């Protein structure tokens, strides 16, 4: 779920509830696909993640936010600043925004360290992750816009001993 170039207007509050649908059909549970799909309300009942968030427009180009996600019981705070806005006459041909988010997982300690041999001290900082993104966008026509989203994610704790910041591979379930 990528962010867009848009920010919340000054003195406006945006409340969102996001829902990521789960599996619509599991052949191991029900051989009849239509029955299973209807029973799970076409994936609605099998939510893989639910999130609520509040975003507030400090200015027309600065938004701050807080949120909570079901996945890993994560609370987060975010900020988005748009220093450059595209003009209709293409005098300024693109918009640029910077987005940053800090997350904290509140899941139980035994769940946080599940599946690993723990031979180190528990550290509260293991629960924190950081995300930063530069959003570069241009509306080319009435029906076509493009975005370029270089991003950086750092987790203070991962199960495998790989570089926590620079490896895009994410096979450890975190």
Tell me what each language-model feature is.
Residues 1-121, 128-132, 138-140:
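Transmembrane beta-barrel domains of Gram-negative outer membranes and organellar outer membranes
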